[in-house]
Amino acid sequence: MKLSIIVKKIGMLIALVFVMGAIGQSVLAQNLDTQNLVRFSGGIGDISTGSTNTTVRGVAAAGQIWVIRDLAADVSQNGSIRLDGRGLLLGAGDAVGSNGNASVFATLFCANDGNVQHSSNPAGVALDVNGDFRIDDTLSPAPPNPCTSPVLLIRVTGAGSWFAAGIPKN
């Protein structure tokens, strides 16, 4: 009889631990979600036309066509950025399908602060041969909270022109 009571109590304790764990994960997920300032899912490559209509928030487009297969980025309220890009490659010309030996950095613009450039380290990260890259950095200066009408540009080091843009995620 005592053994069955002990087994029941252990079962209840295990169930309680699982419930508390689930609640804890839910709270943690909500806290992480509220720390995000802006998120981006998907990317648009630069299709230069030779006119100024490809200038975005004062930044000129690259001189050649660039394509990007995928982009995902999270910018936190403290300005930290985690960005994964896939397949950022030249989309035309003699070097089509190559990474152009480029290095890139990210810049976030917010309409409510006059489109100040909030950038990752301008020394950038080199594109892998297949155009993949990761930026794990802190934007400087830190963006405002909230950040209205956010625009995220992937830019080439040196010249600073843009190769790709992130698509804001709601």
Residue ranges: model-predicted function:
Residues 1-8:
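N-terminal secretory signal peptides that target proteins for export/translocation
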Residues 11-22:
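Bacterial N-terminal signal peptides
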Residues 56-100:
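Short, surface-exposed binding/anchoring microloops in extracellular/periplasmic proteins
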Residues 80, 101-105, 149:
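Exposed beta-strand and adjacent loop surfaces of beta-rich binding modules
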Residues 87-89, 110-112, 139:
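A mature extracytoplasmic/lumenal domain signature
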Residues 95-114:
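Extended low-complexity, serine/threonine- and proline-enriched intrinsically disordered segments
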